[in-house]
């Protein structure tokens, strides 16, 4: 229902009566997709020629928060901290009004016992076939949610292995991303945003440098050329414009922008420390 209301409202604002009809249609598709996932039917029409990009984006958005809700329950029950973490992620995405309510509803449905996790992930993988960077974004979103409280519970780790395997990632690939996200969490706590915006007024500590290297996926012994290659690879995989062109929902673009800023800050810190351009 909410999909139709939101679609009609924005459709009318953007396109008058015709836009209203189109908005109603797309909103109906969103509502139908959400019901199909929750009832165990998976993403109906996902990956087919009939499925338009708006529907796929809506389904990706729904799945992201529904799986996040399932992740929050991995410890056995959902605490106020998990709810706070989900709200913080919504804040990072600048979600307000109806978009935020849709995310909250998806998160809530993912917590329920009957949520079809593996069917949902299989359809996400099907829809993103040939778009490895979108699958990586989806996995990293769940890793960020798991790490957002500063620790990773064993049950969360086990569930992340299920998610990664379902999306086509190996255990080694997951563990690498877990290490990188743990470093990214520390890097964020160290205030890289303020440092990046202010031009690094103070020399970074040894720990900050170590985290910066790990954010890029290289060791401290890496040469300048290796650092540059790692940076270009990471930016190529996480560039917001490229992700948008491949179907990343607009609501999730802010997360992609923040990741790109994080990579840039880590690279700048290492570049200045090593003294290369």
Curated annotation (Swiss-Prot):
Listed GO MF terms: protein-folding chaperone binding
Superkingdom to which the source organism belongs: Bacteria
Record's keyword terms, sorted: Cell inner membrane, Cell membrane, Chaperone, Membrane, Transmembrane, Transmembrane helix
Cell compartment(s), UniProt: Cell inner membrane
Domain spans labelled J: 211-277
Annotated Gene Ontology cellular component terms: plasma membrane
Alphabetized Pfam families for the sequence: DnaJ, TerB
Subunit and partners: Homodimer.
Name listed for the protein in its UniProt record: Co-chaperone protein DjlA
Source organism: Photobacterium profundum (strain SS9)
Species classification: Bacteria, Pseudomonadati, Pseudomonadota, Gammaproteobacteria, Vibrionales
